[in-house]
């Protein structure tokens, strides 16, 4: 497993950053190309990674999943 060997065979041709997985390189390349394939259905925002879209959607749903340990506020 590459995780423990430190092997990073996938290199970005633009900035030479290296990755352990080809799909990590593919996602990284979007930073250079400007591709943002994930679109918010509520507004005009677009995102490189689906996780960022999911986090953004909380703006529209009002979901606040994290609680403050000091005041119990969200």
UniProtKB/Swiss-Prot annotation:
Zinc finger residue extent: C2H2-type: 1-4, 10-32, 38-60, 66-74
GO BP: segmentation
UniProt keyword Repeat, yes or no: yes
Source superkingdom: Eukaryota
GO molecular function list: DNA binding; DNA-binding transcription factor activity, RNA polymerase II-specific; zinc ion binding
Compartments (UniProt record): Nucleus
InterPro entries, per the entry: Znf_C2H2_sf, Znf_C2H2_type
Pfam families: zf-C2H2
A cellular-component GO term for this protein: nucleus
Record keywords, A-Z: Developmental protein, DNA-binding, Gap protein, Metal-binding, Nucleus, Repeat, Zinc, Zinc-finger
Principal location listed in the UniProt entry: nucleus
Family statement: Belongs to the krueppel C2H2-type zinc-finger protein family.
PANTHER family named among the record's database cross-references: MYONEURIN, ZINC FINGER PROTEIN
Function: Krueppel is a gap class segmentation protein.
Protein known as: Protein krueppel
Organism: Musca domestica
Organism classification: Eukaryota, Metazoa, Ecdysozoa, Arthropoda, Hexapoda
Gene: Kr
């Amino acid at each position: 497993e590459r995780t423990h060997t430190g092997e990073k065979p996938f290199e970005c041709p633009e900035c030479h950053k290296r990755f352990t997985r080809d799909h990590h390189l593919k996602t990284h390349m979007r930073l250079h190309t400007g591709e943002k394939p994930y679109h918010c259905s509520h507004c005009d925002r677009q995102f490189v990674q689906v996780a960022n879209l999911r986090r953004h959607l909380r703006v529209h749903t009002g979901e606040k999943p994290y609680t403050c340990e000091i005041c119990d506020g969200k």
